[in-house]
Amino acid sequence: MHPFCCVTTVSDHSPSMPPLPEPQPPLPNYAADFGSARSEPIITRSASQSYNHSGQFNNNLIHSLSFNHHQSDVTDRLGQRVLALPAAVREPPVDVKINDIVGNGIAGILYKWVNYGRGWRPRWFVLQDGVLSYYKIHGPDKIFVSPETEKGSKVIGDESARMISRHNRRGGSSSSCQLRRKPFGEVHLKVSSVRESRSDDKRFSIFTGTKRLHLRAETREDRTTWVEALQAVKDMFPRMSNSELMAPTNNLAMSTEKIRLRLIEEGVSELAIQDCEQIMKSEFSALQSQLVLLKQKQWLLIDTLRQLETEKVDLENTVVDESQRQADNGCSGELRHEKFSEGTATESDDDNERGDAAEEEFDEEENTFFDTRDFLSSSSFKSSGSGFRTSSFSSDEDGFESEDDIDPSIKSIGCNYPRVKRRKNLPDPVEKEKSVSLWSMIKDNIGKDLTKVCLPVYFNEPLSSLQKCFEDLEYSYLLDRAFEYGKRGNSLMRILNVAAFAVSGYASTEGRICKPFNPLLGETYEADYPDKGLRFFSEKVSHHPMVVACHCDGTGWKFWGDSNLRSKFWGRSIQLDPVGVLTLQFDDGEILQWSKVTTSIYNLILGKLYCDHYGTMRIEGSAEYSCKLKFKEQSIIDRNPHQVHGIVQNKSGKTVATMFGKWDESIHFVTGDCSGKGKLSEDMSGAQLLWKRSKPPGNATKYNLTRFAITLNELTPGLKERLPPTDSRLRPDQRYLENGEFEMANTEKLRLEQRQRQARKMQERGWKPRWFMKEKGSESYRYKGGYWEAREDGSWVDCPDIFGHIDSDQQMIE
């Protein structure tokens, strides 16, 4: 609304006004001076219309001032016509259109999309006062409607009318009707947008900024009526730019100069002219100030509504997470499946709705990013006979359950290795951990060189980055199965298992908020795990940039790679982009390669710290098939995060399989191309499990380590004597932290970091890694062999004691 469209006179009862002069003869109409060729509507108000006793505008002030069509000019307090406003500075009379379309409200049945399992569900929608509310019409929370409750509202649709008639015949007290009219959800049209579907003439959607409602009317005409009503209500809210709000009042003097000259020519006294000018200036100034204030209040209200919506979502997520945790602790897997599969009477509609995959634009390239949670909990998937459960973790330690469709000979792979007894808990802490504030740490180090600031060990977990590389191989049985499938000529199942393995490496990052130790230059880590049928070795090969290289020998396969991270700090978050290629080579000669996706860590300063992985991962090589995996980025209020969607294509580009799941739970697949719009629900019965995350330890550690991660830093009997002096298990600060000796851990960490600052000089003098070398014509590192042979001989002559103490006179030469 333009600020000049509501010009009015000052109240006769203002105590600050001077005495009224004698009445003057009426002035001629000078509307033509403002470029208007027609008579314009008058805009007047009395004292009672202008302000209430608290100094606020009346509710209907704007409409009563803007669209009064009974006179043509603005009059002053003397009854004289002062000016007529041009049409360009007034908004169109949309209230007339709104009254014609909306009246006192709109009501009726619309079908709301819930999820793939429940589909379209009827809801009773009511549009009133700029708010679209909806109610359930079935179940204990259903709404009761009648001609009395819907009095004054325009009811849309034959089915809606029949429902009112049916409820009216059954009868019901007015009080009971009001008690049942508690909305199940609300949408404020002020901050929403409405869009019609192009593919279905009965469907439309409403986007609120935080969620999308997909709705379907009975007929095409009903949709048109609803959309027109919604749009008309939206048009009722004025849209004004800051430049319009802050328009200077000095323009008023320029605009009235012509009238001033004409009035002087007509013989009007100078006192009367000045009085009119003062009245207009005062009114314009007061109105402009009020509009600016109202605009500010409007934005504050919108921000408050958005904040309340976010807090509501967070609270609902907390309740759902707590319910799931209690169910996991006290119920069997089957009961948990029933809990998450069936919609209950008290279940929130917003927990079940994730939008229509045909309309959501999560991924333009692949058409749809379907809701994994809703898919796995749908009734059609549940009844497929696959036996898969939708609980977050399997009930055993190795994650081999619920694989009834897998060949028994394949299923047994990974289970026939010798058993090795490993620890299940970290040692009990010796000391009580001190609470450390990040803010206090920043305050204590103001003005210092941050590169020389030693972060306390309270921000670390008792693992190094070298050990974290091996943690990605927790589900190495997937590679064993991939090798066996390839031997049998099933290349499709081979790449599907490799893709599941590539995703499984991210599962251990969920809930891990502490950073691993940064290895020293030349630090190594070995993992001889006969219970997994593999041997792993890694080494830090470069300090600037920090590069870690690794190599692993498995059953029928070899895996190697190097990793370097490029970080971007965004204030409240940090983005980590991996640089490097991971290579998998099977003994039959087939090679597959891929790179990791982007990882971001959020809420570094305030809020709950969490990480997310997103981007596209492509698995390609000499194989018959290639795979593309899309990790969906988590939004701030996403209720179903961590989704992964992938497709497997042959050399001709045809999609032969579709993968879906969550990187912290499980991955499933169906054969054929099911990534198109709406296709997923048609092929639920053929879904098969590829991988499921292992169950977390019974006694969770403060670091949220997995069962597998707890074993990585363990010194089993006789192992210490066989390790080189560079192994991460022998690093003192890391060992002290694991034992809960925090003071000693901090002391040792400071000592080692001071020593590590000499690593750049070592590297500049031509230092080379002991067990890895650069490939020719590439920046990648390959294992050159010899480690396990040296381990057998116990010969570590060339390995420096990088963790030992160095006297000041034995410091590295600068």
Curated annotation (Swiss-Prot):
SMART domains from the entry?
Answer: PH (SM00233)
Which InterPro entries does the record cross-reference, listed alphabetically?
Answer: OSBP_sf, Oxysterol-bd, PH-like_dom_sf, PH_domain
Q: Name one GO biological process term.
A: lipid transport
Fetch the Gene3D superfamilies from UniProt: 2.40.160.120, 3.30.70.3490, Pleckstrin-homology domain (PH domain)/Phosphotyrosine-binding domain (PTB)
Superkingdom of origin organism: Eukaryota
PH domain mapped to chain residues: 103-235
Q: Which tissues carry this protein? A: Expressed in roots, leaves, stems, flowers and pollen.
Q: Where is the composition biased (Acidic residues)?
A: 347-366, 395-407
Q: Does the keyword Transferase apply?
A: no
Region: Disordered, residue numbers: 319-366, 379-411
Q: Which UniProt keywords apply?
A: Coiled coil, Lipid transport, Lipid-binding, Transport
Q: Which residues form a coiled coil?
A: 300-367
Q: Where is the composition biased (Low complexity)?
A: 379-394
GO molecular function annotation? lipid binding
Q: Which family does it belong to?
A: Belongs to the OSBP family.
Biological function: May be involved in the transport of sterols.
Q: What is the protein name for this chain?
A: Oxysterol-binding protein-related protein 1C
Q: What organism does the record attribute this protein to?
A: Arabidopsis thaliana
Lineage summary: Eukaryota, Viridiplantae, Streptophyta, Embryophyta, Tracheophyta
